[in-house]
Swiss-Prot record:
Gene Ontology MF, one: RNA binding
Organism: Influenza A virus (strain A/Turkey/Canada/1963 H6N8)
Residues covered by region (CPSF4-binding): 180-215
Superkingdom of the organism of origin: Viruses
Pfam entry (one): Flu_NS1
Protein name, UniProt field: Non-structural protein 1
GO cellular component: host cell cytoplasm; host cell nucleus
Function of the protein: Inhibits post-transcriptional processing of cellular pre-mRNA, by binding and inhibiting two cellular proteins that are required for the 3'-end processing of cellular pre-mRNAs: the 30 kDa cleavage and polyadenylation specificity factor/CPSF4 and the poly(A)-binding protein 2/PABPN1. In turn, unprocessed 3' end pre-mRNAs accumulate in the host nucleus and are no longer exported to the cytoplasm. Cellular protein synthesis is thereby shut off very early after virus infection.
Cellular compartment(s): Host nucleus; Host cytoplasm
Motif Nuclear export signal location, chain numbering: 137-146
Similarity comment text for this entry: Belongs to the influenza A viruses NS1 family.
InterPro entries assigned to the protein according to its UniProt record, in alphabetical order: NS1, NS1A, NS1A_effect_dom-like_sf, uS15_NS1_RNA-bd_sf
PABPN1-binding: annotated segments: 223-230
Keyword Chloroplast attached: no
Amino acid sequence: MDSNTITSFQVDCYLWHIRKLLSMRDMCDAPFDDRLRRDQKALKGRGSTLGLDLRVATMEGKKIVEDILKSETDENLKIAIASSPAPRYITDMSIEEISREWYMLMPRQKITGGLMVKMDQAIMDKRIILKANFSVLFDQLEALVSLRAFTDDGAMVAEISPIPSMPGHSTEDVKNAIGILIGGLEWNDNSIRASENIQRFAWGIRDENGGPPLPPKQKRYMARGIESEV
């Protein structure tokens, strides 16, 4: 196993521990807690894949970070902060919406590009809106936290979420996953519209009508993939 992979995991575990302490002391906001829950799942998945104990990895990560801080100067820290762009956090969904439990009568799911697409294909003839929470860097979607589909009456009918045990995903992965989701839901005569944030930061366009910015041919093509249930 590559030593850099182990070191990276150990440091990530310790930094997550520090962030958890902040959360326990009520020193952070809702997006911070949201990322904390997401990263906890990712670390558990990575730990299982690497065969490493999280507690031991956290202690080793602490030693690594402390050694680095001993040799770090304030001037170096200022330069590092100034040269690193900070991602923004976009929230279409409330805490209640992103943490809500939901059930499917006719479940379908597909894995694509490190993302899990789930939908209830029992849903028919509904008006559905797609909402997402994600980070943005350089005015483009950087990392998806969660995308969920809701009917007009608030029922949740579909979801796209990162798979913790798999490596990260790209903007194109998110686009493809949304295409699969839209195609699968439209197959049952549902009317889909994406939030303005999804359209702006995933596709870089604005649609005044809130319609999904995918050509019909692309949606039909990707909808075929939903037939292969995982």
